């Protein structure tokens, strides 16, 4: 079957491109050209029937990925579906199922059956569970797992094909070594076998499988820095050069490509990292994990990384992989998913505003106008997380009459600056009254930059419990 890239190169605007154009408020021909040039991807496996197509590229609204998945000690299929529902509810544009234990096939196929957003995987995780030791992996097993997951409907796969044997000595002086799970597994395999990375050696065979199902390849950064001390080092950039080569090889097979990036990077190096990737990989969409801008805040790494993610997106990164408060500490639950997504939706939206995306600031202006008008219900309705906003307000002023009040508990009646400003404008002749001017219904913004958060067509998920906090229920009353 033909891939989105092959269709685009042939001049065909597909149904998926039409849907993307609608969601992005862009011309369908522009979408087609971006895909044809490899500057954007539409991850859309032919077998993912529940998918509502979306696009990832620097010329479009910044997207956010949420990692879900279990580990051997924790979480089963039902809990993972609840995480999926939570992720979509709070605005994930894609999800990655990173499960490493339990019934992997059931978890994966259930996620794909219910998910309206693209589902990504890291196939080497399943491959490792099918052998006694990682050193027992074979190229044939890796190809078999990739093909099986493609048949199941996976939309994009992370393949750490750029970690080469000659790169490994470059990590010797690092502080935290190789922190990518896939990268470390392959490094050990190469060391024990004295052979080259099998994902690199069999990359053309892998691309043939991916093209058959239109699976987008996400070229993994197996040598990404896991600490500020290791950022922008020789190992990271040697792998990046290989990823540039692999990008062009995948394109030759008609496979859509995005490239993954760090990691942990000081703030002043982030823009240079993004620009380098865009140059080396010929503009293929950059998909970054954070990056974290400091290593001192375990428990708050959704914040340390969202700071870096904002800068990365401002510089041209196309998709941000969220980090939850549990990063480096444990497996996230549904509430951690909520917190991580809030941080990253803020990062993505802030970058889109900074980059002047059409209509992106309209949402901000509408909230500000509702705030100035003391229209509390409208503020809650427009908020990124309506339940959280209403809950915080009602903790101190719970009665309904306070929804009409011209103050909150921060300043009280006498010291509310906006109330004082309004009174001054009404009393004198020197200042005119202020009026609301923003019409979100006519905004040129992409869907992800307009409320409500979580705008995917998700009818199938209605059958799955969503473990949202009680304050969400209150906000909907």
Curated annotation (Swiss-Prot):
One of its GO terms (molecular function) is zinc ion binding. [4Fe-4S] cluster binds at residues 408, 411, 416. Residues 427-477 are annotated as: Disordered. This is Phosphomethylpyrimidine synthase. Residues 427-440 have a biased composition (Basic and acidic residues). Zn(2+) binds at residues 264, 328. Pfam families: ThiC_Rad_SAM. HAMAP family: ThiC. It comes from the Archaea. Catalyzes the synthesis of the hydroxymethylpyrimidine phosphate (HMP-P) moiety of thiamine from aminoimidazole ribotide (AIR) in a radical S-adenosyl-L-methionine (SAM)-dependent reaction. The keyword Transmembrane does not apply. InterPro entries: ThiC (IPR037509), ThiC/Bza_core_dom (IPR038521), ThiC/BzaA/B (IPR002817).
